């Protein structure tokens, strides 16, 4: 224990090599947050400062903070520290930052705090033009996520964990409004930037994006925007054309009758023989629940019937041997196949059937 206390003292040592050695050793103790809480969270304060240190030290400091941030006291200390959050924002929006992915992970943890809601409308300094031309923090992070997939913005990062960060912010009404409103700087509705990632190779990215799409679907008045084709405009804004991006992860290589296939969305017709549905059953359930939310209005139900969603869900039910997926399929099919006068409303579902925002 004395050795551990000494290591904690070394976190603010003047010698770089000693700080690095201390961080290296303390990563192995980060499964126990209590180690870093005494006295008065001083080690946590030291770690926050080390995030600005040389990359090897900063990476270890961030790894420790990621691991201990599930502790409620440490979690609140980090999320409520505006100066520290600004440090994270400054670094993650630097296209040369070597610890950008670790920062994305930490932000995804901190996004569960209501303190982080302030980032939705927070203005800050502009980053490099290659990153974003918006003065708003959330725009900048979204641009990192979109442009940085596969290391195309920062060779050290893919920003995948920002998917969880975005999903958490979409739990808030102000967050959903953000994702569904056209931004001035690029004249794009943010949710339309995310849809292309529903079939991305990164499981983290697919899962977070699916959750974000589901959460914004709670805004029933925006369903026309979500369901409209991108060649249509709703209140002067191009439609998001959300359906193909929800349905494709649910689609496998099954063949449909000529009549069924002819009425499906173009993206769902003539899929390759090696087409595989998403392998994560939780993601499948998320997409199925999004579709159920989109049946809240008669217009939504009519749209899903028109584009032959039922045959696709039928095959998903048959091919996926998972109780959660099959239950979600059943709930959706009941709505799609029911006579209109019997059609239920989402808000009238039994308590144990209610769909909730996730993350």
Question: Where are the language model's segments positioned?
Answer:
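Alpha-helical solenoid repeat architecture
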Residues: 9-11, 15, 19-33, 46-49, ...
């Amino acid at each position: 224990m004395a050795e551990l206390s000494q290591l904690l003292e070394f976190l603010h040592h003047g010698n770089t090599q000693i700080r690095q050695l201390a961080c290296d050793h303390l990563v192995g103790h980060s499964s126990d947050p209590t180690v870093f809480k005494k006295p008065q969270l001083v080690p946590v304060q030291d770690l926050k400062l080390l995030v600005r240190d040389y990359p090897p030290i900063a990476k270890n400091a961030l790894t420790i903070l990621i691991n201990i941030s599930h502790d409620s006291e440490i979690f609140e200390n980090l999320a409520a520290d505006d100066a520290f959050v600004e440090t994270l924002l400054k670094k993650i929006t630097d296209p040369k930052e070597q610890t950008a992915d670790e920062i994305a992970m930490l932000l995804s943890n901190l996004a569960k705090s209501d303190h982080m809601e302030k980032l939705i409308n927070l203005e800050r300094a502009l980053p490099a033009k290659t990153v974003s031309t918006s003065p708003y923090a959330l725009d900048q992070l979204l641009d990192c996520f979109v442009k940085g997939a596969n290391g195309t913005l920062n060779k050290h990062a893919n920003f995948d964990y920002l998917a969880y960060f975005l999903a958490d912010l979409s739990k808030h009404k102000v967050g959903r409004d953000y994702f569904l409103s056209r931004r001035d700087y690029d004249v794009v509705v943010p949710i339309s930037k995310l849809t292309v990632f529903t079939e991305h190779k990164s499981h983290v990215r697919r899962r977070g994006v699916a959750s974000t799409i589901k959460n914004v679907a709670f805004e029933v008045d925006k369903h026309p925007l979500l369901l409209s084709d991108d060649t249509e405009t709703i209140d002067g804004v191009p439609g998001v054309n959300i359906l193909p991006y929800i349905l494709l992860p649910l689609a496998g290589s099954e063949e449909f009758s000529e009549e069924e296939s002819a009425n499906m969305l173009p993206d769902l017709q003539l899929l390759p023989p090696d087409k595989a549905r998403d392998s994560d059953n939780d993601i499948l359930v998320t997409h199925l629940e999004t579709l159920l939310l989109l049946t809240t209005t008669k217009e939504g139900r009519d749209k899903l019937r028109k584009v032959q969603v039922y045959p696709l869900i039928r095959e998903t039910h048959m091919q996926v041997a998972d109780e959660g997926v099959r239950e979600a399929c059943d709930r959706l099919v009941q709505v799609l196949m029911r006579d209109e006068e019997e059609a239920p409303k989402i808000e009238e579902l039994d308590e144990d059937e209610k769909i909730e925002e996730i993350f």
